[in-house]
């Protein structure tokens, strides 16, 4: 395993550990999810470029589109929860049920 793959994998693991440690706050969870998606994007892009997979060259762009949609939905949920309850605790999401 080259150093590039090791560093990207380490970034993914650190984001996953951050998600597990800071899971009580919504903002911290969203930042860790973005770190995971960014490391997956870089890993896919590097793998496709090194192995010359021309048919799979759209996969990182599709992943980036889904990451942007996830970030927008998460940010809107964060704004709604913080305006309603004043905090960004994940446990407040249970109170938003209709």
Curated annotation (Swiss-Prot):
* Record has NAD as a keyword: yes
Gene3D superfamilies cross-referenced by the UniProt entry: 1.10.287.3510
Topology relative to the lipid bilayer, per the entry, is: Multi-pass membrane protein
* EC top class named in words: translocase
Where does it live in the cell? Mitochondrion inner membrane
A GO MF term: NADH dehydrogenase (ubiquinone) activity
> Which InterPro entries does the protein's record reference?
NADH_UbQ_OxRdtase_chain4L/K, NUOK/Mnh_C1-like
Q: List the disulfide bonds.
A: none
Query: Which Pfam families does this chain map to?
Result: Oxidored_q2 (PF00420)
Which cellular components does GO assign to this protein? mitochondrial inner membrane; respiratory chain complex I
In terms of one coarse class, where is the protein primarily found? mitochondrion
What residue ranges are annotated as transmembrane? 1-21, 30-50, 61-81
Give the keywords, sorted. Answer: Electron transport, Membrane, Mitochondrion, Mitochondrion inner membrane, NAD, Respiratory chain, Translocase, Transmembrane, Transmembrane helix, Transport, Ubiquinone
Indicate the quaternary assembly. Answer: Core subunit of respiratory chain NADH dehydrogenase (Complex I) which is composed of 45 different subunits.
| Role of this protein | Core subunit of the mitochondrial membrane respiratory chain NADH dehydrogenase (Complex I) which catalyzes electron transfer from NADH through the respiratory chain, using ubiquinone as an electron acceptor. Part of the enzyme membrane arm which is embedded in the lipid bilayer and involved in proton translocation.
Q: Which family does it belong to?
A: Belongs to the complex I subunit 4L family.
- Protein name as it appears in the record: NADH-ubiquinone oxidoreductase chain 4L
From which source organism is this entry? Pagophilus groenlandicus (Harp seal)
Phylogenetic lineage: Eukaryota, Metazoa, Chordata, Craniata, Vertebrata
């Amino acid at each position: 395993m080259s150093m590039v793959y090791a560093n990207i994998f380490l970034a993914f693991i650190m984001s996953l550990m951050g998600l597990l440690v800071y899971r009580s706050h919504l903002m911290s969870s969203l930042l860790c999810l973005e770190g995971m998606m960014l490391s997956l994007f870089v890993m896919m892009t590097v793998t496709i470029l090194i192995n010359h997979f021309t048919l799979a060259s759209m996969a990182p762009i599709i992943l980036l589109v889904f990451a942007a949609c996830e970030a927008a939905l998460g940010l809107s949920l964060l704004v709604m929860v913080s305006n309603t309850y004043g905090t960004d605790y994940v446990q407040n999401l249970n109170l938003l049920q209709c």
